[in-house]
C-alpha cells in the first residue's frame, strides 16, 4: 500500500514537472498546418535519440493517413539490425482549430485513450511551403525529428533548416542521422 502511494505520488510529481516545463517553453509551432497536405509518407532524416526507436537501424518512415473520424492514422516503420521491420501504429488528433500545427499522438491501445498520459505532444515546428521538409518536436524540446518526402535532402535545404532549429534552442550536436538506403 505504501509502494502504491509512493508510485502514485511519483507519477503525479513527474506530470506536474512536465507540465511546468511545457508551460515555461517558448517553442512555437508553425502558424498553420494544412493537415491534408501533410498526409502521406515522410522519411526520417535525423532525430534526437529516443526510447521509441531504440531497435531501429535505418530506413525509418512515418505514414499519415486521414481517417473518417477526422483523426489521423500514424504508422511508423523502421528496419531493425537483423534486417526485419518494426512497425508501430498509432492515432493522432489535431488540438484547436482545423489548421492547428499542434497535435496529440498515442500508440497505446484505444482502450487507454481516455488517459491523458498516453497522448504525447506532436508539434510541427518547421515546414517548407511545398510540404517536403519538416521538423517536429514538443514544448520541452526533448524530442526532435527532421522529416522529408524523399529519403535524401538537398544539403542547402537541410543546412538552412538546421540553422533555424538551432535558433530555436535545439542542440544540433544531439542529432542522429538516419540511414535511408
Task: Please give the residue ranges for each predicted region.
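A beta-rich soluble binding module of mature secreted/lumenal proteins
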Residues: 1-181
